[in-house]
């Protein structure tokens, strides 16, 4: 069993780990099954989400869950191998998972998203919060930006859109055997993607790559994951607090 993807916990492991925290917190990796060019696997987003969860689970007493491996990848439909579910289905899967966790005594859930097209996850968390539930979506754009800076990632988040420096780096660190030769010459930049939702990815790239995978390295991948694990600490504190603290700036 590959425990980097499917946790090998027993029920007693979960019970003991939960006793070390004020509240039990589960982390759910959500990815996709979509093209990532000729050099990265269809499961890249799921592998990235699971790598983040593994790093988090090594640092915090959380309950790691098996991944949701198919997401909302409709913009990649022109490439063979891509599979999608509807946003309604993904919404239901996450909400049902949270409901089931609460019945077994785990009352907080962090959704760790590995695919930018899973827009509905933000709505799931908004609605759960409005119902008084404890849920978070991770990583935020700010967390990725901090990780980029710490790891020395050259490409901006705008340019590094798909199968680029960040994803290649994380896979070179976590699953180097899955990165095929040729990524070093696969760079393709298309920063102006304003009609992406209307036209799909194929309007902007023939290869499926938008970014600079040639700049990826295992060392950058290691630092990206370490930074994200550090950023997770604030989310863990919020979800395990007796009362969810208010966040905000000063009054002007």
Over which residues does each language-model region extend?
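Extended, histidine- and acidic-residue-enriched regions that form the cofactor-binding/catalytic faces
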Residues: 1-108, 114-252
């Amino acid at each position: 069993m590959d425990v980097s993807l499917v946790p090998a916990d027993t029920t007693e492991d979960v019970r003991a780990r939960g006793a070390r925290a004020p509240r039990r917190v589960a982390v759910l990796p959500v990815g996709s099954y979509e093209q990532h060019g000729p050099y990265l696997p269809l499961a890249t987003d799921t592998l990235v989400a699971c790598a983040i969860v593994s790093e988090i689970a090594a640092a915090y007493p959380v309950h790691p869950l098996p991944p949701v491996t198919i997401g909302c990848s409709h913009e990649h439909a022109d490439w063979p191998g891509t599979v999608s579910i509807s946003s309604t289905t993904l919404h239901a899967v996450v909400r049902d998972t949270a409901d089931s966790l609460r019945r077994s005594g785990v009352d907080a859930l962090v959704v760790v998203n590995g695919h930018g097209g899973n827009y509905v996850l933000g709505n799931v968390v908004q609605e759960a919060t409005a119902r008084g539930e404890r849920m978070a979506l991770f990583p935020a754009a700010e967390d990725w930006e901090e990780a980029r800076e710490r790891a020395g990632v050259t490409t901006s988040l705008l340019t590094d859109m798909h199968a680029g420096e960040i994803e290649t780096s994380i896979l070179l660190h976590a699953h180097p055997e899955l990165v095929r030769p040729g990524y070093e010459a696969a760079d393709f930049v298309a920063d102006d993607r304003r009609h992406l939702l209307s036209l799909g990815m194929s309007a902007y790239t023939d290869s499926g790559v938008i970014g600079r995978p040639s700049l990826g390295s295992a060392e950058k991948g290691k630092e990206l994951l370490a930074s994200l694990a550090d950023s997770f600490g604030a989310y863990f504190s919020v979800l395990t607090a007796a009362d969810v603290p208010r966040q905000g700036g000063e009054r002007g």
